[in-house]
Design a protein with these regions (language model features):
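Positively charged n-region of N-terminal signal peptides that target proteins for export
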Residues: 1-4
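Hydrophobic h-region of N-terminal signal peptides that target proteins for export
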Residues: 9-17
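Intrinsically disordered, low-complexity
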Residues: 20-72, 79, 165-170
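Exported/periplasmic cell-wall-interacting domains
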Residues: 21-31, 74, 90-170
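Structural motif
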Residues: 42-44, 81, 112, 122
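Short beta-strand segments
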Residues: 56-58, 82, 121-123
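Generic structural signal for buried aliphatic residues
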Residues: 82-83, 163
Length: 170
């Protein structure tokens, strides 16, 4: 019995280390505040607390093409660490998705959370008039959420929130 107890006590640090959140490895990039991790492969956006524990997970749509964004029009979502540098009320904004339907009103849902992606001023996290696209690769490069989810996310974040977009698998 003493041997079993000793073994359990010896393994306790290893077991507790394995129980850490999968997001703790990003804490050094998060600046001690809640942050966002976007998994393009899993079609998820996770809001994470300053200790690395998930607060809330949302379904997303990301760019049609795989890999990191390199040039305008490549239909790829950027990869890396960014910050939200603008919280734009997007009601009434239009966009032509070049699908033959012409300009779509409220194309970005209620909010557009602009990211500071070098060389690209028009990449962000936003809502959608196409909720059926969530869980698919359907965007020109942005991260798309259901409108109710972008409203919820916007209420939980602030200007300067760190956004980590994980790379596509190679």
């Amino acid at each position: 019995m003493k041997k079993v107890l000793f073994l359990l006590l010896a393994l306790l640090p290893a077991l507790s280390a394995g129980a850490q959140s999968r997001f703790t490895k990003y804490l050094d990039q998060a600046e001690g505040a809640p942050f966002i991790v976007i998994d393009k492969q899993g079609f998820t956006l996770t809001l994470v607390d300053p200790q690395g524990e998930p607060i809330k997970e949302y379904g997303i749509s990301c760019a049609i093409n795989y890999g990191p964004k390199k040039v305008r029009g490549d239909h790829k979502t950027p990869e890396g660490t960014f910050k939200i540098n603008e919280l734009l009320n997007a009601k009434g904004l239009t966009h032509d998705f070049k699908d033959g339907k012409g300009p779509i009103k409220d194309a970005y849902g209620p909010w557009f959370l602009r990211l500071d992606v070098p060389g690209f001023w028009d990449i962000g996290i936003h809502g959608t008039p196409f909720p059926e696209s969530i869980g698919t690769r359907a965007t020109e490069g942005c991260i798309r959420l259901r409108n109710e989810d972008i409203l919820d996310l916007k209420s939980r974040i602030k200007l300067g929130t760190v956004v980590i977009i994980l790379p596509d698998p190679v």
